[in-house]
Every structure is written in C-alpha cells, then in structure tokens.
Amino acid sequence: MVDMMDLPRSRINAGMLAQFIDKPVCFVGRLEKIHPTGKMFILSDGEGKNGTIELMEPLDEEISGIVEVVGRVTAKATILCTSYVQFKEDSHPFDLGLYNEAVKIIHDFPQFYPLGIVQHD
C-alpha cells in the first residue's frame, strides 16, 4: 500500500472538501476549537469557513494559530489527519486570506499548476 505522505495532494479550502472525498489533501487554517477528547479540532480557512480535522490519537501537545494539515478527506467531508505542522508567526504573520486566493488560483488554472506529474529529463 502506498504511504499517504508519498502521494501528491491538492491544496484545498473548506469549500472544496466535498469535491475531494477519499483523496489526499493539504489544508491550512487557523485553529478555532479543540474537542475535549483531543482527537478532533476545527480550523477556519481564509474565507472563515470551517474544516473539521480528525486525529487517530489524541493531541500530545498544545497547538494554536495557523496549522497545516495533511490527510485524506472522509465521506463526512472531514480530514483524517496524517500529519500537521504549526506555523510560527512570531515575526511575520501568515496572511490566510492571501493564501486562500492562491489556492483558488491553483484550482482555476490547473493547466499551470499540474498535480502529481513527474517530469524526467
């Protein structure tokens, strides 16, 4: 079986979740809420729409701010997280709105942003 981390993954926002059921994705958002069990959290994207992130194991660290999640979209249009990274915003705040615009452009012009195409020289 192919490891999820090795697959090409689309960058998406919350409005695109339903289009990517059972596909690997990358989602960036601001942490809004952590479920009391620690096995789920909610991120808001650059448009203020929420995406629910499910974890296999409870969080073992505090998270806050901007988080990038890699995972697979479930049938419930949530993301089953394979890995996540917190962005450091100490000196340079992350512009989630601008990032969201870039995600839209990538999807509006797929001919210029091919996904998963390997070129051999």
Swiss-Prot record:
Sections of the chain in a coiled coil: none
Modified residues (N-acetylvaline): 2
Description of post-translational modifications: Ubiquitinated by RFWD3 at stalled replication forks in response to DNA damage: ubiquitination by RFWD3 does not lead to degradation by the proteasome and promotes removal of the RPA complex from stalled replication forks, promoting homologous recombination.
Primary site of residence: nucleus
Gene Ontology cellular-component annotations: DNA replication factor A complex; nucleoplasm; site of double-strand break
Gene3D superfamilies: Nucleic acid-binding proteins
UniProt keywords, alphabetically: Acetylation, DNA damage, DNA recombination, DNA repair, DNA replication, Isopeptide bond, Nucleus, Ubl conjugation
PANTHER family per UniProt: REPLICATION PROTEIN A 14 KDA SUBUNIT, REPLICATION PROTEIN A3
Protein name per the record: Replication protein A 14 kDa subunit
Species for this entry: Homo sapiens (Human)
Upper classification of the organism: Eukaryota, Metazoa, Chordata, Craniata, Vertebrata
